[in-house]
């Protein structure tokens, strides 16, 4: 008997199901009209370069002062219950401008959204998207575990400028549809999402338009006893439209995955679920096909790579202990490539906004904790066509997040988050190994431990105002055996600590510190053609350390309105080159207002 195709089965289910509205605005709360909101920010700083390096450096400016004023005015209109549009106009002025000199005006955001027939949601223009960690996803940035409150204002600037929502979403321009269907039998509900976006425009010559499209179909089963299943199919495709320019070749990247979350035990003391995701990727470079010329239907693309991945495990929740535990086995193939999931937040090839080059030789300063904490210039939300460079001192086990290719092993996690308790904590442990050796048959082993804790000290010490402690650490080791030339042994430790104390009504004292040490050696490959290893430029050897610490005051005028004045100092030291040790001191004031 010929099996029933899944598409036909889905179509039959959709036809049999009554449509249900998703997120339609409540009738009682609707008021047509125009609203205004936005953000205002004033930022002024002075930075000074010092340390041993400056004893001989006669070319680098020791002190830099700059700043800016930014006003983002959002104008939104809702003429009826089912339609809403919004535009954000940015006015920016660099401090030092005179009578309008240095002022720029630009449109930062435009979108429209609404509901069709009280059932289908749509959005056009700027939009934020996330599916799963292997399809469309924005991994967390390097050099951060649990940011101290002292560094939060600068982190908020980075997140705002790069459209980071905090939910691992990527910013795109395009269109999106969402709708849900309810069922009386077989399934409880089905949710459908489809999207199409342009992620790169054409220059009408050698750079073609690059598009991204895909979607998700998710289904939820009725609950039968303790058992209930949620499953979904995710698909994302990135392709170059070669008809939009004169380019002779372009890329294609297709990723499809299935995910499932099956609850097998529900109780007051214990709830257990089985979780899994698996799929495949296709990455290829194809030539333009001339419609007037004869083409070979069996012709192979210029480059084609395919691979698979899967992760499967168990998640257990202990409600009485406010504890959630999970353990998964992970296998991500060496040639697995998913551009919309593996593109990093930090682009190490970008220029730093402060002291990009230092020393008499004008060497480019390596990205450090100082830049990772505060510099929007090195961050991006763009989707790249290949694996981006990374720094093994900050993230070597999972530089591209959970979708990092060529990894097999275990990922364990625990979250302790009780209601009303002064302590919350989480920990992640990853024990991984390469699937395929790079430049040798020997395989690297990766061990990663990441832990964070938030402690409300006020109830513990009897303090009448806010008093909070934040802690974070990341310990990472990479090792490989074999001959001396093959051997790898790199260890990095990152520590974070911060203290926030309200000393007067809405006046906070902020203290924070971050420190990293790294020692050992590794081989960092040069990547070409999606994720192919082209070469190893030589061993990456390091024995260095850096620290960033500071203190400041913050006055909260109201919710999302504050002024902070801070003093910070950053130091970098390498045992192999002590004459190049340097430090950067920074004093800044930041006023931020959301309205």
Q: Model-found features: residue ranges?
A:
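Positively charged n-region of N-terminal signal peptides that target proteins for export
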Residues: 1-5
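Bacterial N-terminal signal peptides
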Residues: 7-17
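Signature for the C-terminal beta-barrel architecture of outer-membrane proteins
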Residues: 23-33, 62-66, 80-102, 119, ...
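Surface-exposed strand-loop-strand hairpins of Gram-negative outer-membrane beta-barrel proteins
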Residues: 30-32, 43-68
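Histidine-anchored nucleotide/phosphate-binding helix
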Residues: 71-75
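Hydrophobic or amphipathic alpha-helical targeting/insertion segments
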Residues: 106-153, 159-164, 168-171
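C-terminal beta-signal and adjacent terminal beta-strands/loops
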Residues: 558-580, 595
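Blade-level signature of beta-propeller repeat domains, shared across WD40, Kelch, NHL, RCC1
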Residues: 589-592
């Amino acid at each position: 008997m010929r099996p029933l195709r899944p598409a036909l089965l889905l179509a039959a289910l959709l036809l049999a199901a009554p449509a249900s509205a998703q997120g339609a605005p409540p009738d009682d709360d609707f008021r047509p009209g125009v609203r205004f909101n936005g953000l205002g920010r004033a930022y002024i700083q002075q930075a000074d370069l010092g340390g041993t390096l400056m004893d001989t450096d006669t070319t680098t400016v020791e002190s830099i002062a700059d700043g800016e004023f930014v006003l983002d005015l959002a104008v939104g209109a809702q003429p009826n219950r089912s339609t809403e549009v919004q535009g954000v106009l940015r006015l920016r002025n660099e401090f030092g401008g005179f009578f309008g000199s240095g002022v720029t005006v630009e449109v930062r955001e435009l979108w429209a959204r609404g509901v069709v027939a009280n059932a289908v949601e749509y959005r056009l223009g700027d939009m934020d998207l996330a599916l799963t960690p292997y399809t469309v996803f924005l991994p967390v940035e390097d050099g951060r575990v649990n940011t101290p409150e002292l560094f939060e204002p600068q982190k908020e600037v980075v997140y705002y400028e790069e459209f980071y929502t905090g939910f691992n979403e990527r910013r795109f321009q395009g269109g999106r549809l969402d709708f849900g269907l309810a069922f009386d039998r077989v399934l409880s509900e089905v949710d459908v999402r489809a999207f199409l976006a342009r992620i790169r425009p054409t220059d009408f010559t050698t750079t073609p338009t690059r598009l991204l499209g895909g979607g998700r179909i998710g289904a939820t089963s009725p609950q039968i006893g303790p058992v209930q299943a949620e499953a979904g199919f995710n698909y994302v495709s990135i392709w170059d439209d070669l008809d939009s320019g004169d380019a002779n070749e372009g890329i294609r990247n297709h990723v499809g995955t299935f995910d499932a979350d099956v609850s097998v035990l529900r109780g007051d003391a214990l709830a257990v679920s089985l979780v899994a995701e698996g799929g495949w990727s296709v990455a290829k470079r194809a030539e333009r096909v001339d419609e007037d010329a004869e083409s070979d239907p069996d012709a192979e693309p210029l480059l084609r790579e395919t691979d698979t991945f899967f992760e499967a495990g168990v998640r257990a929740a202990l409600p009485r202990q406010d504890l959630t535990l999970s353990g998964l086995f992970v296998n991500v193939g060496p040639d697995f490539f998913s551009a919309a999931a593996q593109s990093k937040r930090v682009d190490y090839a970008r220029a730093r906004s402060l002291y990009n080059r230092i020393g008499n030789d004008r060497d480019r300063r390596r990205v450090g904790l100082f830049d990772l904490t505060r510099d929007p210039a090195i961050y991006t939300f763009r989707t790249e066509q290949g694996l981006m460079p990374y720094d093994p001192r900050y993230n070597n086990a999972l530089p591209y997040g959970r979708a990092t290719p060529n990894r097999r092993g275990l990922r364990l996690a625990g979250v302790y988050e009780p209601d009303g308790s002064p302590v919350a904590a989480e920990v992640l442990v990853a024990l991984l190994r390469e699937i395929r050796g790079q430049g040798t048959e020997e395989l690297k082993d990766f061990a990663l431990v990441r832990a964070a804790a938030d402690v409300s000290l006020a109830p513990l010490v009897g303090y009448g105002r806010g008093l909070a402690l934040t802690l974070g650490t990341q310990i990472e080791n990479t090792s490989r055996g074999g001959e001396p030339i093959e051997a790898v042994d790199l260890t990095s430790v990152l520590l974070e600590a911060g203290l926030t104390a309200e000393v007067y009504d809405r006046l906070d004292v902020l203290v924070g510190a971050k420190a990293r040490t790294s020692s050992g050696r590794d081989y960092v490959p040069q990547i070409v053609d999606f994720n192919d290893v082209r070469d190893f430029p030589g061993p990456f050897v390091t024995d260095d350390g850096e620290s960033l610490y500071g203190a400041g005051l913050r006055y909260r005028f109201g919710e999302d309105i504050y002024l902070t004045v801070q003093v910070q100092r950053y130091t970098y030291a390498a045992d192999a080159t002590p004459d190049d040790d340097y430090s950067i001191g920074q004093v800044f004031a930041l006023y931020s207002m959301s309205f």
